[in-house]
From Swiss-Prot:
Protein name: Alanine racemase
Organism this protein belongs to: Streptococcus pneumoniae (strain 70585)
GO cellular component, one term: cytosol
UniProt catalytic activity: L-alanine = D-alanine
Gene, per the UniProt record: alr
PROSITE patterns: ALANINE_RACEMASE
Residues reported to bind substrate: R136, M310
Any one GO MF annotation of this record: alanine racemase activity
Amino acid sequence: MKASPHRPTKALIHLGAIRQNIQQMGAHIPQGTLKWAVVKANAYGHGAVAVAKAIQDDVDGFCVSNIDEAIELRQAGLSKPILILGVSEIEAVALAKEYDFTLTVAGLEWIQALLDKEVDLTGLTVHLKIDSGMGRIGFREVSEVEQAQDLLQKHGVCVEGIFTHFATADEESDDYFNAQLERFKTILASMKEVPELVHASNSATTLWHVETIFNAVRMGDAMYGLNPSGAVLDLPYDLIPALTLESALVHVKTVPAGACMGYGATYQADSEQVIATVPIGYADGWTRDMQNFSVLVDGQACPIVGRVSMDQITIRLPKLYPLGTKVTLIGSNGDKEITATQVATYRVTINYEVVCLLSDRIPREYY
């Protein structure tokens, strides 16, 4: 989707806030711990290349979801190590070697498929993924882990790391987290040779389970100033939200009682009202279920009336405002603030999804 810079709708990204969040997290983890910045999904909607360039001196490497995201970073001139967290296509091995990426290996079948195709693995670097209870990808038995390690090393692969991912690190109960941790530790203790890099800490683990950090952490949601638990757990220290979502009034009118708004005529004015149009809609990631949520104009909460359209929303104003008046959808306006977590709560989802859904049609502006 092509960006629309000639619209007033934009996402403002505070790169300094991201750097401060990295420094804040770094100050609360053991000295010498490697810091990997997770910039998958366009850096959680913040812009992968711009974010990675801004923080490259603050981190030891980057994590992405797939090889195309990794290629984007290399082609932008970023030289730090890049770990691809997902399972890559067999055909991607040559690209991984060419661009010096680190691949995730999650199963013996994948390795065997490479060997069956006689793919040259010499010089490839990998991390082994352990499924300690997340249930998506990874080895579950130590015998499989050691078999994979032996096969890979026999064919010239550098098995640099081993990692897992926790399913409930951002929840109040530690029971399942501790069970996963023990399973991961058991596998490590049973291995004849543990790879150099061992990491299990995502943002939530880094924040609330610092005592369980191995020798590297993966900084994701929290790096962007978001609370991984939403509103379930309090942050142990301050983080600065890096993203503000803004637009402006493009049409303002006074309507009589009985006037209807939007598809389905789901809103009807019960009195004379001031209604304004804002150019953002579900094609931008401001989803259709946001009817009745409020945005901020002149420091005041103004409800979205009528259904969210593909490109526009209508809001009710307390009075007439001139065209071009700023509208804040996420961020501060006057003495009020709307957070990504508040948007997520209204949608019955998580703040990760709110920022990741902001489409490429919204220009990102950096400061």
